[in-house]
Amino acid sequence: MPKSTSYAILEAIQGEMRRDKHLTLFYEYQRPAAGWSNRGINLEGEFGRTRVRFCAIDEEWIVGGALGMSMIGVPAIAHIPSMATFIPYELMFNHAGKLRHMTGGQAAFPMVLWADMARRWAFQAGQHADAGLESSYARLAGLKVVIPSNPYDAKGLMISAIRDVDPVVFCDYPVPASGPEVPDEPYMVPIGEPAVRTEGKDITIVGYAPQTAEIARAVEELKNDGISAEFIDPRTLAPLEGVMPTIIESVKKTGRLLTSDEGSYTFCNCAEIIARVAEAVPGAKFKRLAFPDAPAPGAPEML
């Protein structure tokens, strides 16, 4: 049985907490524990409440605490559930992303905002559960934003985020247990390095979690129609400097770019990708698929 994304993330944090005796996790009501096969992870049980802090439901305090610890050189992770990822936005915008620049590069702020991102689905919160804010965080200068689409990338990107000296927003969408097998030992997936999921020559498709499973199925359907699609998963949404060369070279080869984005059509992440490709590849054709500029529905009949 493959490891789940949640288990892979906790395995990454467990390994890093063993490696770094100062690393601290703040969380509220989602207990940091998971099981796989005949094994289990319970971070609070292993490391105690001094380093795995069960907090009141106050997302600003949680992120502020992690940010404050990082300011004195203690790496920290703040885990925020899906319906509350917008609450600490001001702290990330006004402090986390700016403090390195305000100190002239003399200080580092090694913190991770582990942000649950909920897909649109019907339950008690309805529209209020639509909390995919990766586009909002990606446009904040000074932050790095990563978004894994499988358990392997989730573990490797979490380790990279923890070891990074700058604040990283780790966007955690519920994704299927697919992709490469997740090793038990630690490894890093570099921030800023995209993944070419499928090679092709007729069209370039760019999309990220939680769209990747649907895109993979679409690539197979296109293959049945004689169309060879190249599928690129950015994995990093900010900064894009390391991601764009792979996408640009692909579009130079195919001449066509289709992007798929879970966010709203206007100002979505893929709009920025298209803009950069348009500047670099004259004559290429583009199409953007994204959610309409409207509040997401909460009724089951509309999902």
Per-segment meaning from a language model:
Residues 1-167, 171, ...:
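Thiamine diphosphate
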